[in-house]
């Protein structure tokens, strides 16, 4: 059997504390037993299920809602003082309670009680029940306290493990971050080096292209100049060939003239004089040939020969010719 004891103050005797006990078998809706005492006297009464249904009909309320209001009024420690009020008439043993709603109040329930002949027994049962309830609550409190201590230890253990996990996690994150920074810096260094290599390669390529362009321009300019140089060289070689041929012819003729003027015998003879005269007579015929050779040499381009060689050659020929022209038989004999 379940029971509930609460402390109330009656409207008729507010200075006296009364104790109200409500006990029931299954549910409050199936009926309950109510006991009221002031510590000296005791009153008790039984409320059946039919009476509860009759009260709900009189209140024009559903039974379940009415039982809920009874629970709040009788089992919740009389509720707030300004919501539920209790009153009891010792002469008629009539107990009733009301509910206040702002300025309106209505009677929630009323029961007829009977006075107990041996109130001490009722009071003793109330005291025993209270002590048992206190002991039970104390045991529950101890059990709950132990459970709380165990949970606190478990919580501390879990908190310690959690802190260790957090520390390990932070250390792992720090380590991973450091490794990530190292890898990132290495990648950045490699990227910078590759970028620098690309820039250097591009600069070298530009330099090579510029050098190739300059080389191509120089080669084109050299190719343009080579034909002119080759032509001038060919002309100079032809002039040198012609002049060398003329010079050799002139030298050979001078040698012949000089050899013709050599005298081997010391004593003069008529034959020698005659031969000399014939030679002198034929000498003017050779002069035109020398003049023709000089004209040919002068008509040819002599830009390739040095001026000094030309002058020496011409002076040698003139001297030989003048010597031949000015020489006479008498002079030759005088010299001999």
Curated annotation (Swiss-Prot):
Effect the entry attributes to changing residue 331 to L: Does not affect ability mediate double-strand break repair
PTM characteristics: Phosphorylated by PRKDC at the C-terminus in response to DNA damage; Ser-260 and Ser-320 constitute the main phosphorylation sites. Phosphorylations by PRKDC at the C-terminus of XRCC4 and NHEJ1/XLF are highly redundant and regulate ability of the XRCC4-NHEJ1/XLF subcomplex to bridge DNA. Phosphorylation by PRKDC does not prevent interaction with NHEJ1/XLF but disrupts ability to bridge DNA and promotes detachment from DNA. Phosphorylation at Ser-327 and Ser-328 by PRKDC promotes recognition by the SCF(FBXW7) complex and subsequent ubiquitination via 'Lys-63'-linked ubiquitin. Ubiquitinated at Lys-296 by the SCF(FBXW7) complex via 'Lys-63'-linked ubiquitination, thereby promoting double-strand break repair: the SCF(FBXW7) complex specifically recognizes XRCC4 when phosphorylated at Ser-327 and Ser-328 by PRKDC, and 'Lys-63'-linked ubiquitination facilitates DNA non-homologous end joining (NHEJ) by enhancing association with XRCC5/Ku80 and XRCC6/Ku70. Monoubiquitinated.
GO molecular function, one term: FHA domain binding
UniProt keyword Phosphoprotein present: yes
Result of changing residue 324 to W: Does not affect ability mediate double-strand break repair
Reported impact of residue 69 to R: Does not affect interaction with NHEJ1/XLF
Effect upon mutating residue 43 to R: In SSMED; impairs the protein function in DNA double-strand break repair
Subcellular location: Nucleus; Chromosome
Outcome of mutating residue 260 to A: Reduced phosphorylation by PRKDC. In XRCC4-Ala mutant; abolished phosphorylation by PRKDC; does not affect ability to bridge DNA
Cross-link (Glycyl lysine isopeptide (Lys-Gly) (interchain with G-Cter in SUMO)): 210
GO cellular component terms, A-Z: cytosol; DNA ligase IV complex; DNA-dependent protein kinase-DNA ligase 4 complex; nonhomologous end joining complex; nucleoplasm; nucleus; site of double-strand break
Impact reported for residue 26 to E: Abolished interaction with NHEJ1/XLF
Outcome (variant: residue 260 to D): In XRCC4-Asp mutant; phospho-mimetic mutant; abolished ability to bridge DNA
Coiled coil location: 131-165, 184-212
Stated consequence of mutating residue 233 to A: Abolished phosphorylation by CK2, leading to strongly reduced interaction with PNKP
Result, substituting residue 328 to A: In XRCC4-Ala mutant; abolished phosphorylation by PRKDC; does not affect ability to bridge DNA
Effect the entry attributes to changing residue 106 to E: Abolished interaction with NHEJ1/XLF
Bias (Acidic residues) ranges: 229-239
Location of the region described as Disordered in the Swiss-Prot/TrEMBL record: 212-249, 264-336
List of residues that carry Phosphoserine: 53, 193, 232, 237, 256, 260, 303-304, 315, 320, 327-328
Motif (Nuclear localization signal): 270-275
Protein name per the record: DNA repair protein XRCC4
Organism for this UniProt entry: Homo sapiens (Human)
Lineage, highest ranks first: Eukaryota, Metazoa, Chordata, Craniata, Vertebrata
């Amino acid at each position: 059997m379940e029971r509930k004891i609460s402390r109330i103050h009656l409207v008729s005797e507010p200075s006296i504390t009364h104790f109200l006990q409500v006990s029931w078998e299954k549910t409050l809706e199936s009926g309950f037993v109510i006991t009221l005492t002031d510590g000296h006297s005791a009153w008790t009464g039984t409320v059946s299920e039919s009476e509860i249904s009759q009260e709900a009909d009189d209140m024009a309320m559903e039974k379940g809602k009415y039982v809920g209001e009874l629970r709040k009024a009788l089992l919740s420690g009389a509720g707030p003082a300004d919501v539920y009020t209790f009153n009891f008439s010792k002469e008629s043993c009539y107990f009733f309670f009301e509910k206040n709603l702002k300025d309106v109040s209505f009677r929630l329930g009323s029961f007829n009680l009977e006075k107990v002949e041996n109130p001490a027994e009722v009071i003793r049962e109330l005291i025993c029940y209270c002590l048992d309830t206190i002991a039970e609550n104390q045991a529950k409190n101890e059990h709950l306290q132990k459970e709380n201590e165990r949970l606190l230890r478990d919580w501390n253990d879990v908190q310690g493990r959690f802190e260790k996990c957090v520390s390990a996690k932070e250390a792992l994150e720090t380590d991973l971050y450091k490794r990530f920074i190292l890898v990132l810096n290495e990648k950045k260094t490699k990227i910078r080096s590759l970028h620098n290599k690309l820039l250097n390669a591009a600069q070298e390529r530009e330099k090579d292209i510029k050098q190739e362009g300059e080389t191509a321009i120089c080669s084109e300019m050299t190719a343009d100049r080579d034909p002119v140089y080759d032509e001038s060289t060919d002309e100079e070689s032809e002039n040198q060939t012609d002049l060398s041929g003329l010079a050799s012819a002139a030298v050979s003729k001078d040698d012949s003239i000089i050899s013709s003027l050599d005298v081997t015998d010391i004593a003069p003879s008529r034959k020698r004089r005659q031969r000399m005269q014939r030679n002198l007579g034929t000498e003017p015929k050779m002069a035109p040939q020398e003049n023709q050779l000089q004209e040919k040499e002068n008509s040819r381009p002599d830009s390739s020969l040095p001026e000094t060689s030309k002058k020496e050659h011409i002076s040698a020929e003139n001297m030989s010719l003048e010597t031949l022209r000015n020489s006479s038989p008498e002079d030759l004999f005088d010299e001999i």
